[in-house]
From Swiss-Prot:
GO terms for biological process: mismatch repair. The gene is mutS. It comes from the Bacteria. Keywords: ATP-binding, DNA damage, DNA repair, DNA-binding, Nucleotide-binding. The keyword Cell inner membrane does not apply. NCBIfam families: mutS1 (TIGR01070), PRK05399.1 (NF003810). ATP binds at G607, P608, N609, M610, S611, G612, K613, S614. This is DNA mismatch repair protein MutS. InterPro entries: DNA_mismatch_repair_MutS (IPR005748), DNA_mismatch_repair_MutS-lik_N (IPR007695), DNA_mismatch_repair_MutS/MSH (IPR017261), DNA_mismatch_repair_MutS_C (IPR000432), DNA_mismatch_repair_MutS_clamp (IPR007861), DNA_mismatch_repair_MutS_core (IPR007696), DNA_mismatch_repair_MutS_N (IPR016151), DNA_mismatch_repair_MutS_sf (IPR036187).
Amino acid sequence: MTQYTPMIQQYLKVKADYQDAFLFFRLGDFYEMFFEDAVKAAHELEITLTSRDGGSSERIPMCGVPYHAAKNYIEQLVEKGYKVAVCEQVEDPKTAKGVVRREVVQLITPGTMMEGRTIDEKENNFLAALTHFEDGSYALACNDLTTGQNTVTLLTGSVEDILLEVYATGSKEIVVDSSFSKDELNKLTETLKMTISYEDATAIPEGLEHLVKNVSQAKLIKAVGRLFNYVIRTQKRSLDHLQPVEIYYTNQFMKIDVHSKRNLELTETLRTKEKTGSLLWLLDKTKTAMGGRMLKQWMERPLIQKERIEERLEMVETFVNDYFLREDLKEKLKEVYDLERLAGKVAFGNVNARDLLQLRRSLLQVPAILEAISLLDNAYASRLIQGADPCESLTELLGRSIQENPPLSIKDGDIIKDGYNDKLDQYRYVSKNGKTWIAELEKRERDITGIKSLKIGYNRIFGYYIEVTKANLAALPEGRYERKQTLANAERFITDELKEKETLILEAEEKIVQLEYDLFTALREEVKVFIPKLQHLAKVISELDVLQSFATVSEEEQFVKPVLTTKREIFIKDGRHPVVEKVLNGKLYVPNDCIMPENMDVFLITGPNMSGKSTYMRQLALVTVMSQIGCFVPATEAVLPVFDQIFTRIGAADDLISGQSTFMVEMLEAKNAIANASERSLILFDEIGRGTSTYDGMALAQAIIEHIHDQIGAKTLFSTHYHELTVLEESLDQLKNVHVSAIEENGKVVFLHKIQDGAADKSYGIHVAQLAELPDSLIARAKEVLAQLEGQEEIIIPKRVEVKVQEAAPEPVVVKEEIAEIQETKVETEEESQLSFFGGEQSSKKQDKPLLDQKETAVLAQIKKIDLLDMTPLEAMNELYRLQKKLKKG
C-alpha cells in the first residue's frame, strides 16, 4: 500500500471495511470511486471510466459523480441490489493538516433505503434478520426503517417453509450470521433474490432495550439484537423513531402459503407481477399511504379470531350506513400525509421544512377526525381512538415557525416565519432596511446632540462612522462616542449602537441563513419528542382509512356483510369473483352459489375447460379472505366459518420452486395440504394429476380425495377431468358432484358459467380447440378420433402400447402406457359395458374374430372382477403387476 499516495492509502483503508459495497469517496464537489469499484460502477451507471495517478507505476481506474446528483446514482445501484458506503470529509480542508479526514457516515442498502423511487409509498421496505438455532428452529425479525416498525416471530419446519415465510415479508435484504451454510445462502440469493448481509452481534444495543420490554424469549431477542446491531452499524445516526417490537405467531393468523397467495392473486397478478388486477387493487380505496400499507399487511395476514373479525365488520357496516360521515372522513384523510415516514425522517435528521409543513397540515385534520369517530356508538371505534393525541401544541409550534412555501433545501434560508425569533427578525430588518435604519439613526443622533451638520457615513476601511465638525465637538455628550478617525476639519466617531448595527448590516445575509438553519435543527429536535405520539396517531388513522376503504368498495360493488358461524358450513348465495366482475366493467357476470352444509366436505367439480371451474374455486377463496380481513363480500348472502388455512393448487407451475416439473409441483403442494390441513381449513385443488399418465393421475386424484374426505375433513373444492371419479359420490357420503354447465347451439359450445348439481356429461375439449383457432383439418381429425374412441364408428383405433418392466424387481413397477381399446368377441352385458370418458355407456360392437387368446381372456375376466374403488393406489399397482407377470409367462 505504501506505493500509493496518502489519499489513495486512505481510500484503501476505508474500503477494506466495506468490501461488499461501492465506496462513494468524497473529493471536493465529487464522489469518486477507484479500482474495481470504478470499473463496475462505470458499467452499471453508464458513466465515463477514466484514470488517475495514484503513486504507483500504473494509473488507477477512476469514475465519479457530482455530490449534488449523487442521490440519483445511489438509488440506481441500490435498486439493482448493491450497497453503497458514503464516505464524507469530516473536517474543513482549509484547516486540515495533511490528508483531509474522512469517514463513512452511512451504508445504504436495499433494506435500509429511506426514500427514493425504490420506495413504494403504499408498501413497507422491510429489512429481515434470520437466526438459526441448534434445535432446528428459526427466529425472524423485520424492521422498516422508513416507518420504525419492528416485528419478530419464531418459526419451525423445513428450510423451504422458513424461506417462504421470509419471502412473504417482502424483504429486499436479509441479515444472517457468518455461520450460515452455503446451501442456505444459495437458497436465499437464488430462490428469493435477496441481498445478503452479515451480523454476528445479537445483544440488544445500549439505548434500545426499551423496545424489547415485551419480548421475553431468548431466541426472539437474539434475532432482534442481530437486526438492531446491523441497523446501528450501517446507519450511524439517531434511531429515535424505532417502535417497540411486535411479536406475532403464524398460528394467530390464517395461513396462506406463498404459492396460494400467488395462485389467488391477492396482492399481485400471476402474469405481470403487478398490483393492477389483484384483489389488493380492487380493495384499495385508501386515501393515505400508511393506510395502503396497513391494508396490504391485513391481506397478508387475515384474522382467525371471530370476535376481532366481527368488530371490523361492524365498523365497516357503520361506515356503509353513514354516507356523509364516510365522505367527510375521506376528504379529511386526503389531507393527511405519511405520518409514519415523516416521523422516521425527523428521527433520521433528513426532514426538511416542506416535510414539517406536511406534518402540520396533517395534524390540522386530526381533531375533527377523532371527534367524528368519538360520536359513533361503537365500542371498537371508541377503543381505537383511545389514547390518540392530536398533538395540538406541535401543530401550533409548526404553525408559527415554518413559512407557508419554504424551499426544499434547509440551507437556503427563508424557512422560518417572521416573529418566531427576535434576533432573526432583527437580521431580516437590517438586511431589508439597512439604509433606512442608518437615515433614522442619523436623524436621532442630530436630535440628541442638537448638531444639525452631524452625518453618518461609510467607507471600506473604517466601516460606518458618525462625523462631527470640530466646531461642534463641544456639543457631544461625554463617554458615549468613541473616536475612530481624525480629519483636518472633523472627527469621526463610533457608538456601541452603531457598531452593533454595522455588524448586523454587513453580516445580515450570512447570519440569516445560519440562524435559520440553527433554528430549524432546534425545531427538529423539539418535534422528535412527539414521535411516539405521531406513530400511535398514524396507526389510528391507518386503521380508519382501511375500514373506510372496505366500506367504500363494498358499497360501490354491492358487497354484503358476511355472517360468521362456529359451524362448519358454507352458505354463499350468488357469489361472484370480485376482480373478474370488476374487469368485466359492467358486462354480465354469472353469479354462483356455494352451499356446503356441515355434513358436506367435498365438491367434485367437472365440466369443460374454460367454463369457469378455476374462477369458481378462486371465488370461494377470495370471499373467505375478504371476510376474514373484515371486508364485506361479493354475494347477496354469505354465512361462513372462520378458516385457519387456505391451500390451493390452481394454475400453472409456480416458478418459485425452480427446476421442478408441473407434476412435481402439484405433488409438493398436495403434500403441503395433506400434511398441514385441518378440518377448519379450505382446500382448492384444480386438475390434480394432469401432469402424469392417465391412470397414475386418476389413481392419485382418487387417493387424495379419499384421504381428505376420510382423514382431514376440510372443506374442499376439487376439480377434475377424470370423469370416472364422479362415481365416488356413491361411496363417499360427504362428497357431492357439481359441474359447470354448457350447451351446444348450431354445433358450437356456449359456456353458461353456472354451477349445477351432478356430474358433467361432456368435455367440449374440441370446441375449446376451435375457440383457440386450431386448423380446421386438425379439428376434423380430432372429431374422427373422438368418435372412434366413443364407439360411434366401427373403425378400430390401432393399439399403441409401450411397456417397460424390470422383471428382476421384487416390488411393483409403474407401467406407463397409452390407453389401448380391448375388443371382445361376444356382446357385452350392461354390467360389462365400458364407461366413456364423460359418462355415457360405450356401445359394444361384435367383432368378426377374437383378438384375445385363452390366457388373456382369463386375465381380462379377473380384471373385470376387481373393485378398484375398494383398493388403495398401491394395492391396485400390485394387482396390475401380478397380472402383468402372468401374461408375460406365456
